[in-house]
């Protein structure tokens, strides 16, 4: 008797991305034959273990087979089409994988906020009930008199206190982050939110960070799941977006 441990993937793109990273393959030049063989090996493993194979995995397998077939077909072209740029059968798949990579990185960054919250905000303590009964040897009249005195004392001390609700906006936090980064071009996200007064402020700061990443003003890296986020300033103008680049 032996046990086989099989990794579970959220969907076909999750599996494909795993195979690409495992084989250290360039997204822009995917060897379809190698990836298809490994992909089908995983599908067969599921079937051998009598596990249901989701329809989207089958659809992706068919797509990979089609791409491989198109790449193997003889390239007969008419003379008038000779000057046209030949379309790579992998092009659409590469676009989808690049998009998936973006969402995967954002999801990892979002998961990091949970770990940061746990670091800065304590959970509510467990309150264990302790029964300590005390006998009150007072009459109703005594209690009423004490209550009346408390009311009179409070009237004398009554002062209106206005508590101004702090408002945080993504725009203001973007400006704040840029101010930090101009002074210190490389820092940890925990350094930014260390003095945050509420969870809301931490969340708004994180959304501001995502916006700066989208604008290519900063690069962010997270070494471990739920870990701190390392931020690098790319300058006031940022840099041009390169889908194939991995920071």
Swiss-Prot record:
It comes from the Bacteria. Its main location: cytoplasm. GO terms for biological process: cell division; chromosome segregation; DNA replication. The keyword Ribosomal protein does not apply. It holds the Pfam family SMC_ScpA. One of its GO terms (cellular component) is cytoplasm. Keywords: Cell cycle, Cell division, Chromosome partition, Cytoplasm. PANTHER family: SEGREGATION AND CONDENSATION PROTEIN A. Component of a cohesin-like complex composed of ScpA, ScpB and the Smc homodimer, in which ScpA and ScpB bind to the head domain of Smc. The presence of the three proteins is required for the association of the complex with DNA. Participates in chromosomal partition during cell division. May act via the formation of a condensin-like complex containing Smc and ScpB that pull DNA away from mid-cell into both cell halves. Belongs to the ScpA family. This is Segregation and condensation protein A. It comes from Caldanaerobacter subterraneus subsp. tengcongensis (strain DSM 15242 / JCM 11007 / NBRC 100824 / MB4). The gene is scpA.
């Amino acid at each position: 008797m032996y046990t086989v441990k099989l990794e579970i993937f959220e969907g076909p793109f999750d599996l494909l991305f795993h195979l690409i990273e495992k084989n250290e393959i360039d997204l822009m030049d995917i060897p379809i034959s190698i990836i298809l063989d490994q992909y089908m090996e995983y599908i067969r493993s599921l079937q051998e273990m009598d596990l249901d194979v989701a329809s989207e995995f089958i659809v992706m397998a068919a797509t990979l087979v089609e791409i491989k077939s198109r790449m193997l077909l003889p390239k007969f072209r008419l003379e008038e089409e000779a000057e046209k740029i030949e379309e790579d059968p992998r092009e659409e798949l590469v676009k989808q994988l690049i998009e998936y990579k973006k969402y995967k990185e954002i999801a990892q960054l979002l998961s990091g906020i949970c770990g940061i919250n746990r670091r800065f905000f304590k959970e509510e303590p467990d309150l264990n009930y302790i029964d300590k009964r005390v006998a009150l040897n007072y009459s109703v009249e005594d209690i009423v008199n004490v209550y009346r005195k408390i009311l009179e004392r409070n009237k004398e001390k009554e002062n209106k206190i206005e508590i101004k609700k702090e408002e945080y906006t993504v725009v203001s936090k973007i400006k704040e982050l840029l101010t930090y980064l101009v002074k210190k071009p490389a820092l940890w996200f925990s350094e930014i939110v260390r003095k945050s007064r509420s969870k809301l402020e931490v969340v708004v700061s994180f959304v501001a960070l995502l916006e700066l990443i989208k604008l290519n003003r900063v690069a962010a890296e997270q070494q471990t799941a739920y870990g701190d986020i390392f931020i690098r300033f790319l300058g006031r103008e940022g840099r041009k977006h390169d889908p194939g680049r991995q920071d």
